[in-house]
Structures are given as C-alpha cells and as structure tokens.
From Swiss-Prot:
ATP binds at residues 149-156. It comes from Pseudomonas savastanoi pv. phaseolicola (strain 1448A / Race 6). Its EC number is 7.1.2.2. This is ATP synthase subunit beta. It is found in: Cell inner membrane. F-type ATPases have 2 components, CF(1) - the catalytic core - and CF(0) - the membrane proton channel. CF(1) has five subunits: alpha(3), beta(3), gamma(1), delta(1), epsilon(1). CF(0) has three main subunits: a(1), b(2) and c(9-12). The alpha and beta chains form an alternating ring which encloses part of the gamma chain. CF(1) is attached to CF(0) by a central stalk formed by the gamma and epsilon chains, while a peripheral stalk is formed by the delta and b chains.
Length: 459
C-alpha cells in the first residue's frame, strides 16, 4: 500500500500528498496513522500527487506531516444477517458496545444501480394501518415514499409509527439510516424496536447531527448497501431514511469546502446527480424488493426549495404534512389534498377505494372553498346541500385523525391499527350520510367507524 503525508487541513477537508506513481483513485479510503485513526475519502485529484479528501470522522488532533496510507479500495461495510439488531456508524463499526459484528463479508458503499433489465415493478399494496395514508396516498411494495414536512409537524413520529406497523406486521428485514438527525431520536428508536421485539429484524446505521459532513453524506449509502445485500438474497426489505434533506445539506457543506461554485439557494451544483445516484440504487429487482420510506425536511415550509423539489421527482407516493392541520390538533397532520400516490388508480386499488378517496378529496376541497363564505356571512347563508357537505367535511377531517402506538406515552390514548377494508367502509359511510346524526367530536382520535359510534353514545 502506498503512503503519503498531510499537506493541508481546512475543516473537514484534508489534502494529502502521495508519490506521483501511486496516487489513490477517487473514492478510495485512506487511513491517517494517528491515535484517532481517522478515515478519509478521496474526492478530487489536484495534480502533482496531491489528492483532496473529506474526513469521515473528527479532524481534531490532526496536523501537517502525519502519515496517511491508501487502503486501495472504497469504504466497505459489513453486510448480511450479522448486521441485524446492531447499531453501526458510517464505516460499519459497531457503536452499541455489543462486541464486533460476526461477519467476514463486506461490500463497498459505492455500487452501480441495477440495470434496466434487472429491475422489476409491481402493484401490490402495502397496508400501513394509518387511515389517511391507506386512503389517499396508498403505498406499494417496492415503492418509494416521501414524508414531507417543516420543523415539528411530525415526520419522525409518522416514520416511527410506519416502522412499528409495517415492521411488526411485515415479517421481512428492515434497515434504518439515521442521517443528520437527533441522537436522542436514534436512542428512542432503538429502545422502541427492542420493546416491540423486532430489533433482531432491523439493522441500524447512524450518522447523527454532531458528525462531520463527510460522515453524514455517506451514511445513507452505508444503510443502502446493507439493504441491497438483503434484497439480492431474495428478501423484501424496508429501508427507512431519516432525514434525506440532511443528506443534501451534507453535500452542500462538502461541496463548498471542496471549492465548487454554489448553485440555486446556495446548494451544490451536483444536487440532482447526488440525489439520483442514491435514489436510483433504491429499487426492486427480480430477486427482491426495497420499499423505501424517507423523511424529507422542508426548509421554511417551502416545497419549491431545490432540495425537496429534487426529491419529489424520485418518489411513487408523497405524504405532505401540513402545519395548518397540525394547528387544528389533527394528527397525523397529513394534508389529504396535497398528498399523492401513483397507485391511486381504479385499475390498481379497485373502483370502490378510488371513488371513496376522490369523494373525500372533493368534499374537503369544497369545504376549503366555502370557508371564506362562512367566515364572512356565516353558516346560515349556505344552501342546504352545502350545509350538509360542510358537516360531512368536518366529520371526515376529524376521522382522518388517529391515535398512534408510538405516541401512547405522550397522549395517554392507546394506538389503533385500522385495516384498509375498515378505512374504506368508514369514509364511504360518512360520504353517503349514514352518520349525519352523530356529533362531529365522536370522530376525533378514534380507530374504525365502530369506535366512533360507541364514542357518540357516551357524549
């Protein structure tokens, strides 16, 4: 292995000089010969034997002149069943203090996406047990879903509930990549999995907020590589990424440090390419499927920001969380008019489901239009049909709320899993006027429609 010396350190970016006949390739992993043993990844070759690298760990204590050795290959991480139930960092090292990972097999984190011929599609629906999602933006097995929302509208709680419902109901493997999120949430999530007895089916990879940008930029690839291994063995895998925006943000930090000119809103000029490299690998092949659920932070609640806008293009279903709905106390704060799914098609989900979903959206849209009239003139000025529609819309709006299992400790209400059949029956009944006689508060924070009828008796 060739070795070189550090010649310049600027934050997380380190320039290393090698002999001209043994310059490391792009994406090679380099090891600094110091007590910390920091790993570097080659990003650019500057000429004269100098390479510009990005550090995967802290650069504290490094100095010019330290020896650096070239590993001769890209960063590789352990893959396979030995990773289940473990927490690892970006380099695949265990950070849960439970001993080394018992596998010899390691895969490089930079891999080509499956070719066109290898890819496979499908229309099998994935039931989540969350009414609003199953109704208006159904997920598909092997599809990609984005949870879009600003700060504090419930992306992580929704993600946790989806993990709980799908990982427990679905018997396959899951990989969770924590990209630039709070360590506290990572810790809560670990204990949540442990208490639900599904930890032995989940591999956890964390590169949290306190890590340098190089680490946060690569940790999503580490998680994805582990998921690809399970897929190639013929499994149906769930890949959860929280948060994909921090992946973009880490790319922005790295890009600026590497001296690239920023593009729109200060993002890196390679934004679309970086996102494409990651997203094109998250796909299903003829061997197995990867169903991916990604949380997407929306800066300043602006969905046209380049980062969320670039993510939209890659998704099959988008779940948009709205601050206005959260402020009404309706959780999950999913906006049924903004959220979309490619599966919302009568040929895929069936005519009854399609008509019910579109009926719900029509009623809520009409209510939105009538709100201005109600605010100025009051309810009395509306026609009888509009009054009836407004009453049904308010019931639908409340019935879209649901108590979550993962939020039991905060709300004190026990969580509810609602099957798709019950969800469709409930909303269809409200649209048909079967429950016009029930008060609207009976529909708030309940599971199925039977529970709403029971609640109405007590009011």
């Amino acid at each position: 292995m060739s070795s070189g010396r550090i010649v310049q350190i600027i934050g997380a970016v380190i320039d290393v000089e090698f002999p001209r006949d043994s310059v490391p390739s792009i994406y090679n992993a380099l090891e600094v010969q110091s007590a910390a043993g920091t790993t570097l990844e080659v990003q650019q070759q500057l000429g004269d034997g100098v390479v510009r690298t990005i550090a995967m760990g802290s650069t504290e204590g490094l100095k010019r002149g330290l020896e650096v050795t070239d590993s001769g290959a890209a960063i590789s991480v352990p893959v396979g069943k030995a990773t289940l139930g473990r927490i690892m960092d970006v380099l695949g090292n265990p950070i849960d203090e439970a001993g080394p990972i018992a596998t010899e097999e390691r895969w490089g984190i930079h891999r080509p996406a499956p070719s066109f011929a290898e890819q496979a599609g499908g229309n099998d629906l994935l039931e989540t047990g969350i009414k609003v999602i199953d109704l208006v933006c159904p997920f598909t097995k092997g599809g990609k879903v984005g949870l879009f929302g600003g700060a504090g509208v419930g992306k992580t709680v929704n993600m946790m509930e989806l993990i709980r419902n799908i990982a427990i109901e679905h018997s396959g493997y899951s990989v969770f990549a924590g990209v630039g999120e709070r360590t506290r949430e990572g810790n809560d999530f670990y204990h949540e999995m442990k208490d639900s007895n599904v930890l032995d089916k989940v591999a956890l990879v964390y590169g949290q907020m306190n890590e340098p940008p190089g680490n946060r930029l690569r940790v999503a690839l580490t998680g994805l590589t582990m998921a690809e291994k399970f897929r190639d063995e013929g499994n149906d895998v769930l890949l959860f990424v929280d948060n994909i925006y921090r992946y973009t943000l880490a790319g922005t930090e790295v890009s600026a440090l590497l001296g690239r000119m920023p593009s729109a809103v200060g993002y890196q000029p390679t934004l679309a390419e970086e996102m494409g490299t990651l997203q094109e690998r998250i796909t299903s092949t003829k061997n197995g499927s990867i169903t991916s659920i990604q949380a997407v932070y929306v800066p300043a609640d602006d969905l046209t920001d380049p980062s969320p806008a670039t993510t939209f293009a890659h998704l099959d279903a988008t779940v948009v969380l709205s601050r206005d709905i959260a402020s009404l106390g309706i959780y999950p704060a999913v906006d049924p008019l903004d959220s979309t799914s490619r599966q919302l098609d009568p040929n895929v989900i069936g005519q009854e489901h399609y008509d019910t979903a579109r009926g719900v959206q029509y009623v809520l849209q009409r209510y939105k239009e009538l709100k201005d009239i109600i605010a100025i003139l009051g309810m009395d000025e509306l026609s009888e049909t509009d009054k009836q529609l407004v009453n049904r819309a308010r019931k639908i709006q409340r019935f879209l709320s649901q108590p979550f299992f993962v939020a039991e400790v905060f709300t004190g209400a026990s969580g509810k899993y609602v099957s798709l059949k019950d969800t469709i029956a409930g909303f269809k009944g409200i649209l048909n006027g079967d429950y016009d006689h029930l008060p609207e508060q009976a529909f708030y924070m309940v599971g199925g429609i039977e529970e709403a009828i029971e609640k109405a008796k007590k009011l």
